[in-house]
Amino acid sequence: MSRIGKLPITVPKGVTVKLEGDNLLTVKGTKGTLSKKFNKDMIIKVEADQIVVQRPSDLKIYKSLHGLTRTLINNMVEGVTNGFQKTLEINGVGYRAQKQGKKLVLTLGYSHPVEMEDPEGIATEVPAPNKIIVKGIDKQVVGEVAAKIREKRLPEPYKGKGIKYETEVIRRKEGKTGGKGKK
């Protein structure tokens, strides 16, 4: 039995869960609505205040889908109640971010500012010029948007300049030491 998959998911008050044919699960909460279609073989049971995921047999594919399905449903419930957020930090001289309407404008040492439009269901905030907060109800989309922002200027190992996640630790490298004094 999957250790994660066998745990029931508690549904908080104010959240409605609806299971339709072909394992289409719709979770509605205070922050919004999420729908996702799961593998038709997985058995999803929606009870009064909890959701239980079971697998049809002990085949390897079902064992791997068991924990995955349970975690995805849990992330949907968590997203519509609390939402998800990722914080990014910008390090570097002259590197900064600012918000213009629904656009995020990044000045990252290129010859032009990098503009990024907020996708549907995602909000970006800039509380300080060197900090970006990405918020949303879908954990996967929040992570993708944060990764796309980070991709615009990856952190480099010598000076640590670039965009990094708040919790990320950049392994620093030593600069070149040889060559001084040679002619």
From Swiss-Prot:
Gene3D superfamilies: Ribosomal protein L6, alpha-beta domain (3.90.930.12). InterPro entries: Ribosomal_uL6-like, Ribosomal_uL6-like_a/b-dom_sf, Ribosomal_uL6_a/b-dom, Ribosomal_uL6_bac-type, Ribosomal_uL6_CS. One of its GO terms (cellular component) is cytosolic large ribosomal subunit. The keyword rRNA-binding applies. Belongs to the universal ribosomal protein uL6 family. HAMAP family: Ribosomal_uL6_B. Part of the 50S ribosomal subunit. This is Large ribosomal subunit protein uL6.
